[in-house]
């Protein structure tokens, strides 16, 4: 990726819904607000981190208040909102229920999608830096007008940090992710290159990182 992407950072001291909503709205002001990213009737996928079914206090997953704040902005724009992820073991709906995001989805009537069906094709890193094919992603992503990436800021054993790029690894269906972890376990550069290629393929229209409490 040769181009620089603009970034907005806002201080938010708690997971109070009003505070989070205000911080998100302030962060998007330079682009004209959330409505600049979506259209009425458009299909929007919210992609949080639903790695494990742990309570939000453990900071393993994206906090449900972050999801609710962004979902409300999308709904206010008249968009059709969906939520999805592909945890390595349990289902997205099960993990969402355990971490509190399921309650938000139910209350706001947002369907939770499982990323089971992959696209038939993989691809290679555009710059062919590492010569490693990248995995197929869920077909669900091809049905969306906008993907809103909602990662949790966390440390990571292989890459040191999990954020906007690494969160999209969850778009690879099911246990296929374990194969790619194994395939690249001794080649951190290859793993990082694969993730960058994955990001370039999916290219979310907006990323909002939950960094109020990291892990």
Tell where the protein language model's regions lie, with residue ranges.
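N-terminal and secondary-structure boundary signal
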Residues: 1-215
């Amino acid at each position: 990726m040769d181009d620089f992407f603009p970034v907005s950072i806002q201080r938010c001291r708690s997971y109070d819904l009003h505070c989070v909503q205000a911080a998100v709205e302030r962060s998007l002001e330079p682009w004209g607000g959330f409505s600049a990213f979506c259209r009425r009737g458009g299909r929007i996928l919210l992609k949080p981190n639903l790695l494990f079914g742990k309570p939000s206090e453990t900071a393993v997953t994206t906090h449900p208040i972050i999801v609710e704040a962004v979902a409300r902005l999308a709904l206010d724009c008249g968009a059709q909102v969906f939520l999805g992820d592909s945890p390595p073991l349990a289902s997205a709906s099960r993990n969402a229920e355990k971490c509190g995001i399921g309650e938000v989805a139910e209350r706001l009537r947002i369907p939770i999608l499982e990323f089971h069906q992959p696209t038939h094709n993989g691809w290679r890193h555009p710059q062919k830096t590492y010569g490693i094919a990248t995995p197929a992603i869920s077909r669900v992503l091809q049905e969306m007008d906008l993907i809103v990436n909602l990662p949790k800021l966390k440390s990571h054993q292989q890459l040191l940090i999990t954020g906007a790029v690494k969160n999209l690894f969850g778009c690879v269906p099911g246990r296929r992710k374990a194969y790619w972890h194994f395939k690249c376990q001794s080649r951190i550069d290859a793993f990082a290159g694969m993730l960058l290629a994955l990001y370039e393929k999916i290219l979310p229209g907006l990323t909002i990182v939950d960094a109020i409490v990291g892990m």
